[in-house]
């Protein structure tokens, strides 16, 4: 096994770093980091992504017929990591989870319409799965879609629909067979692509302590063409699980951790304690930084292994057990890593961005708050452990 970048991958990293240095101007970086809105001032989030799409980078790991460069999943991972290092926004759910599911299960017409627009950075998705009474128990969802001629009529409510303010469509799980119940309730689920401009669709913001906002979305007699159903009717559960497997891996890039580690290390090298000793020379500081570095390296290798095992975006993706294992390790590592880095910074590390005395622009504090949501976004880590036990270890299903 080669546990390093190939010469070609090193060249790609250099090319991407040069590209992002030009893309992320001081003005764009400042606008994206503003506390106004989840991803900065005005339309800078979508404009930045559209620029990456026009430049051909956003979907470089996709087949050329869909607007990509036909590169490997490893190259796509390198792009994701370099974007994170540069602070450039990437629509992970759209690019890395919804789009591969469309490639695997969508009709030719759906592929022709959605995929080139996603690759161009012009089309964004939100995920509509969780409901007030169906979060962890997703198969218990109650949002209905009733067939009426060439349309479905959708009624219901979803929770935790993130990035809805930027979305053109919602990837929506609905119940098309109300008769399914008990152990077979997952068999009555279908997936629809719902325009956010559809009559009867609305949403309200949900502000969180973690920092990133999310939303509640509402569907009141929303008419969705049958042509917008992905896969067969009542057979949407495999699409949901396929998308979630991709999502769980997309949540756990180590690049932001390495970025914060570098900033904290440099700060400790240039900051002295009350006795005049550099903080970096304290053993406990060195241990904290070393623990973060070592575990982030392990996460990087996990992602490399997952990317190397995929033949491309049309691949079925990681196994449920591998996706869940990466998600549990990566999200819990992030929480612990930012906590250890905040210990090094001291009490001022708890001050938020733009607060007087905030260290490193409040970046580590914000990342610590934001990463907490990842332990249950895409499926709670408790359920991920159940999946690992059942699929990888052959243990019986947990009683919940």
From Swiss-Prot:
Keywords: Cholesterol metabolism, FAD, Flavoprotein, Lipid degradation, Lipid metabolism, Oxidoreductase, Steroid metabolism, Sterol metabolism, Virulence. Its cofactor is FAD. FAD binds at residues 127-130, 136, 162, 380-382. GO terms for molecular function: flavin adenine dinucleotide binding; oxidoreductase activity, acting on the CH-CH group of donors. Its EC number is 1.3.99.-. Induction: Induced by cholesterol and repressed by KstR. InterPro entries: Acyl-CoA_Oxase/DH_mid-dom (IPR006091), Acyl-CoA_Oxase/DH_mid-dom_sf (IPR046373), AcylCo_DH-like_C (IPR036250), AcylCo_DH/oxidase_C (IPR009075), AcylCoA_DH/ox_N (IPR013786), AcylCoA_DH/ox_N_sf (IPR037069), AcylCoA_DH/oxidase_NM_dom_sf (IPR009100), Mycobact_Acyl-CoA_DH (IPR052161). It holds the Pfam family Acyl-CoA_dh_M. Pathway: Steroid metabolism; cholesterol degradation. Binds 1 FAD per heterodimer. The keyword Oxidoreductase applies. It catalyses: (25S)-3-oxocholest-4-en-26-oyl-CoA + A = 3-oxo-cholest-4,24-dien-26-oyl-CoA + AH2. Heterotetramer (dimer of heterodimers) composed of FadE26 and FadE27. Belongs to the acyl-CoA dehydrogenase family. PANTHER family: ACYL-COA DEHYDROGENASE, ACYL-COA DEHYDROGENASE FADE29. This is Acyl-CoA dehydrogenase FadE26. It comes from Mycobacterium tuberculosis (strain ATCC 25618 / H37Rv).
